Swiss-Prot record:
The keyword Iron applies. Removes the formyl group from the N-terminal Met of newly synthesized proteins. Requires at least a dipeptide for an efficient rate of reaction. N-terminal L-methionine is a prerequisite for activity but the enzyme has broad specificity at other positions. Its cofactor is Fe(2+). Fe cation binds at C92, H134, H138. It holds the Pfam family Pep_deformylase. It comes from Azotobacter vinelandii (strain DJ / ATCC BAA-1303). This is Peptide deformylase.
Length: 168
């Protein structure tokens, strides 16, 4: 297993639209393992392949306190099951150190493949619903900062660009 490099906003590669995974093979399972290792080391609760510069429709997630509930979503799709949007404070490993409220549906239906390529479906609420929407956004080249005002987004971009200049 290996810890992968996480791309940071405003890296243009984060805007790449991920391609569906055709076959779930050992290479994909190795990527899944590396993504979990990377996410746990960061530390984070979710990671999309786009964030590690692999443009495939793959998300890993673990919302548990003790990191013992790993979830894999291959080619995930979701649909909102409620029209009401609620604010939820979001952060992102690709936008380190920044947290902002984003309005999202609080209940969604998710369809995806598991690490063995088997299809599954689940209804998610609360943090899981928010997290899957956030990670699916990554697969579509979108970041949580895109939901913010231009002023807030530009302020975050400038601060991160300054950090990148200072730390290489």
């Amino acid at each position: 297993m290996a810890i992968l490099t996480i791309l940071e906003f405003p890296d243009p590669r984060l805007r790449t639209i991920a391609k569906p995974i055709e076959t779930v093979d050992d290479g994909i399972r190795r990527l899944i393992d590396d993504m979990f290792e990377t996410m746990y080391a960061a530390p984070g609760i979710g990671l999309a392949a786009t964030q590690v510069n692999v443009h495939k429709r793959l998300v890993v997630m673990d919302l548990s306190e003790d990191k013992n509930e790993p979830r894999v979503f291959i080619n995930p799709e979701f649909e909102a099951l409620t029209e009401e949007l609620e604010p939820y404070q979001e952060g992102c490993l690709s936008v380190p150190g920044f947290y902002e409220n984003v309005d999202r549906p609080q209940k969604v239906r998710i369809r995806a493949l598991d690490r063995d390529g088997q299809p599954f479906e689940l209804v998610a609420e609360g943090l899981l619903a928010v997290c899957i929407q956030h990670e699916c956004d990554h697969l579509n080249g979108k970041l949580f900062v895109d939901y913010l005002s231009t002023l807030k987004r530009d302020r975050i971009r400038k601060k991160l660009e300054k950090q990148h200049r200072q730390h290489g």
